[in-house]
Each structure stands twice: as structure tokens, then as C-alpha cells.
UniProtKB/Swiss-Prot annotation:
One Pfam entry name: Ribosomal_L17
Gene3D superfamilies: Ribosomal protein L17
Name this protein carries in UniProt: Large ribosomal subunit protein bL17
Gene Ontology BP, a term: translation
Keyword match Ribonucleoprotein: yes
Domain of life: Bacteria
The gene coding this protein: rplQ
Keyword Cell inner membrane belongs to the record: no
A GO CC term attached to the entry: cytosolic large ribosomal subunit
Amino acid sequence: MRHLKSGRKLNRHSSHRLALYRNQAKSLLTHGRITTTVPKAKELRGFVDHLIHLAKRGDLHARRLVLRDLQDVKLVRKLFDEIAPRYRDRQGGYTRVLKLAERRRGDGAPLALVELVE
């Protein structure tokens, strides 16, 4: 039975799912907002919130944990020096998911906009 199993599989195996989260997190932190499907957006929200929470700590271990996921030194530097200080007084909810009215042209999948809260 599947009771109390959290998280979505998104029809991918675990390494593919992790690569998807990492790529979308990089895009979101680089550009500030991205458009994706609703289930991917809801999963990305928790992944990015965790990275920002680690960046708020600011210590070396947190930097290494974030670098493990983002694998981009310049982006980690941007996260720690520019993005995390904006959320110094915020206790969570660093990202926002807005459902869009239009659907994807190819398959009609519902789309959402994921953005960093100001």
C-alpha cells in the first residue's frame, strides 16, 4: 500500500528525477522564474526552498551541501551572496507557484509559473 508515501515520481527513475530537480533549480535561481508543468513546479518548490534555507545558514558545510546539488560554483556564490540575504527575516516560503491559464500546446498539460518571492 502507498499510504503516507510523500513525493511524486513524475514517471522517472530516481537519478533522472534528481537531475530534473537540479536542472530546474539552476534555471530558477539563475533567471528568477521559470514555466513548467504543475506537478514539477510543486516538487521544485520544496527542493529550492531547502537550498535557500541551507544558504541562509552561510557556513562551509551548508555551502558544500548546496554545491553538491547545484554543481556550479558561480551559482552557489550568487545564492549565498545575493539571494539568501534577501530572505534573512523570512522563515520559509521562498518560492511561489502560480497556475497559468494556458496549457502546453503539444499535450495540453497544465502549466505553472515558479518564481522567487521578493
